[in-house]
Design a protein with these regions (language model features):
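Periplasmic-binding protein-like
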Residues: 1-3, 102-139, 164
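Short, well-ordered beta-strand segments
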Residues: 37-39, 86, 124
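Solvent-exposed, acidic/flexible segments
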Residues: 43, 67-71, 86, 90, ...
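Short, aromatic/basic amphipathic alpha-helical patches
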Residues: 50-57, 96-101
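A local structural motif
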Residues: 54-69, 82, 106-108
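Short helices/loops that flank or line small-molecule/ion binding pockets
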Residues: 70-94, 99-100
Length: 180
């Protein structure tokens, strides 16, 4: 899956420019040096790398939003100019923006430096005989699924610029997994 990143409105791109390194945002520097708040879904894990940065963020650097529609509400706050930067998972942001009738070309996504372009998903179960058996069966199933079709379905949610790279990276990933 595409990694989490920061999204801004096109008109607010300059907010991130001082923190860009090779097209990626230095999130630690942004949180430490700016009076602008970053909108986050409260109590969500963004992965170990980003979570560590968020836990070290200065007081008041984040605007956490709670509830089932937290991301949609953050995007609405952004659209109204109350918030300039939102942290999230790009396909989810694209979907929620579409639902809120925010045109995709109004938003610009920036990856976070050091986070990695793609994320692996994980399944966890309780550490019991049944849980270990479930994980074993899930792992076996994942190795034999027809990934090509699933990868195409996922890629359809990505912006056109990311689709080809994702499909190539996913193909290589699953080939490596099958060889193990």
């Amino acid at each position: 899956a595409v990694g989490n990143g920061l999204v801004v409105r096109q008109q607010d791109r300059s907010v991130l420019e001082p923190y860009l390194v090779d097209g990626e945002v230095d999130l630690s520097a942004l949180l430490a040096a700016t009076d602008r708040k970053v909108g986050v879904v409260a109590e969500r894990s963004y992965g170990e790398f980003i979570d560590n940065i968020l836990h070290q963020a200065p007081s008041g650097a984040l605007t956490p939003h709670y509830g089932n529609d937290a991301l949609t509400n953050l995007l609405s706050m952004q659209r109204l100019g109350r918030l300039q930067v939102v942290l999230g998972y790009w396909p989810e942001i694209r979907y929620q923006a579409r639902q809120a009738q925010i045109a995709e070309n109004e938003l610009e996504f920036y990856p976070i430096r050091g986070n990695g372009k793609y994320l692996s998903g994980y399944v966890a179960c309780s550490d019991t005989t049944q849980g270990r058996q479930a994980i074993s069966e899930i792992n076996q199933l994942l190795r034999t699924l027809p990934h090509e079709h699933l990868n195409q379905l996922y890629a359809a949610w990505l912006d056109p610029e990311r689709q080809a790279d994702y499909l190539e990276q996913a193909r290589a990933f699953f080939e490596r997994q099958a060889a193990q």
